[in-house]
Amino acid sequence: MMENVFDYEDIQLIPAKCIVGSRAECDTSVELGGRTFKLPVVPANMQTIIDENIARYLAENDYFYIMHRFQPETRLAFVKDMHERGLYASISVGVKEEEYTFVQQLADQHVVPEYVTIDIAHGHSEAVINMIRHIKTHLPDSFVIAGNVGTPEAVRELEHAGADATKVGIGPGKVCITKIKTGFGTGGWQLAALRWCAKAASKPIIADGGIRTHGDIAKSVRFGATMVMIGSLFAGHEESPGDTIEKDGKLYKEYFGSASEYQKGERKNVEGKKMYVEHKGSLAETLLEMEQDLQSSISYAGGKRLDAIRNVDYVVVKNSIFNGDKIY
């Protein structure tokens, strides 16, 4: 049993002496797979969060993205299209038999996505290990992200199999109900799980799920994340794929979990739910606000670059930093 676990709202980072005149001097960029991105943030590879248009926008503006895998037949054309535009391609695959064929097809046509994410709910499995090896055999130049996992053993095993990065988080997301349906996961202690996994990792980690505020991005970086995957904070933008509905004069967009019945069109093996999030305006505004908030975080950390955050002290505030005020 692990003692003393904690989550985002239980932690406060402690400021160090500021060395910049303005937060604008702080650099939030991060490197992953040989490319530099503006932010250590990636929108969740979910159907209500990302589509081709958003992927294109993110790539054009030096942000990281991972395209979802819920329209598998469009992926080949998507990779080709991104490459024709001079942009990088980043896609997701599962572990079923047809995915092996798809990887082979990419290799046969010499269509090599720069990033391939193997994305299943319980990533510590032979199925994922076999798929990592398959991709590394046929697409050796692709950067492989594998997940999702929640233990140091899983991180070590996937790295050993050839994964270039691992994705950590089992069911902590806002529309993920794995924790409720199964009793398993990192819900409620995602930040401690991230720290535990990061200590075992020799390659980058993507923290996935449980982010509710921009400050949580800085906390993720402090505890070892190279990238932070975010769903609900990216849901509900003008550009977001979901349907817009009006209720009591307010605009909302739908947001659902990747294993929800809305996603699957069926009621079996449901581990996701649907919710409506308030319409948030443009994606560019949110990305800018995230950048500015993270620049402030870096200035509080006493540095000029993102890495400064990794060295700050922290306290565990067991009464929750919101003191009963719900801000989300």
Curated annotation (Swiss-Prot):
Gene Ontology biological process terms in this record: purine nucleotide metabolic process
Originating organism: Shouchella clausii (strain KSM-K16)
Xref: PANTHER family: GMP REDUCTASE
InterPro entries the record matches: Aldolase_TIM, GMP_reductase, GuaC_type_2, IMP_DH/GMP_Rdtase_CS, IMP_DH_GMPRt
Presence of the UniProt keyword Electron transport in the record: no
A Pfam short name: IMPDH
GO cellular component, one term: cytosol
Keyword line: NADP, Oxidoreductase
Domain of life the protein comes from: Bacteria
Protein name: GMP reductase
Job description of the protein: Catalyzes the irreversible NADPH-dependent deamination of GMP to IMP. It functions in the conversion of nucleobase, nucleoside and nucleotide derivatives of G to A nucleotides, and in maintaining the intracellular balance of A and G nucleotides.
Protein family membership: Belongs to the IMPDH/GMPR family. GuaC type 2 subfamily.
Reaction it catalyzes: IMP + NH4(+) + NADP(+) = GMP + NADPH + 2 H(+)
Gene3D superfamilies recorded: Aldolase class I
Active-site residues annotated for this sequence: C176 (thioimidate intermediate)
Position of the signal peptide: none
List of residues binding NADP(+): 205-228
Listed EC numbers: 1.7.1.7
A GO molecular-function annotation: GMP reductase activity
